[in-house]
Amino acid sequence: RGRLDARRTLKSLVADLRLIISGHTNLAASVANKTILKTLNERLPEAEIVKLDELYPDFKIDVEAEQQKLLRADIIVLQFPLFWYSAPSILERWMEETFRHGFSHGSTGDKLKGKKLVLSFTTGAPEALYSHKGAMGYTIDEFLACYKATCRLTHMEYSGSVYTCGVSYGNRTTPELIEQQRNISVAHTERLIELLETL
């Protein structure tokens, strides 16, 4: 029985493995995303956090290493600021390089099948602008269609998103405003962890 319990415990640990990919192109200059990652590291020390801007400043992705991280994970979190209605260039590059035919999709590409994908992101503009009548012309959810399509192609499970709006660089003009962004970002992390705990 002891061995059976040990196997169950191991299975539980494996099932809870989380990979968090930071797609900010300049994390050192960030407040919101940097705070979110710092809080995640404190609250989920077992999670693997990958900071793409630090690992690959030249955008030369180590495909094999990144694919191995994906293989180990059960839940994949993409953490990023929304740049021009999409992920930053380094995160796009990471996906282009690691989600390769024969690995993530295609007749023999089933390595991501069944893994859960969660989006965690921030925007500079207020949420009210993301509507059909607002300045952006589309809802936030509509901008996420490409990730849902990616999940469909790779047979991953799209497991939802957590986002925080209105945390722009322009709102960091005083120490008080910077601290406010940090507090908002900690609250964002709490919501993200709540979502992860349901998966």
Language model region names:
Residues 15-46, 182-183:
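N-terminal beta1-alpha1 ligand-phosphate binding loop
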Residues 64-148:
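Helix-loop-strand module that forms the ligand-binding subsite of alpha/beta enzymes
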Residues 22, 51-53, 162-163:
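Residue-level recognition of beta-strand->loop/alpha-helix junctions
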Residues 31-35, 61, 89-93:
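Generic recognition of short, well-ordered alpha-helical segments
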Residues 37, 148-199:
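Glycine-rich phosphate/pyrophosphate-binding loop and the adjoining helix
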Residues 56-64, 173-174:
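Structural motif
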Residues 46-58:
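A short beta-strand-loop structural module common to alpha/beta enzyme folds
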Residues 1-13:
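N-terminal amphipathic/basic-hydrophobic helices that include classical n-h-c signal peptides
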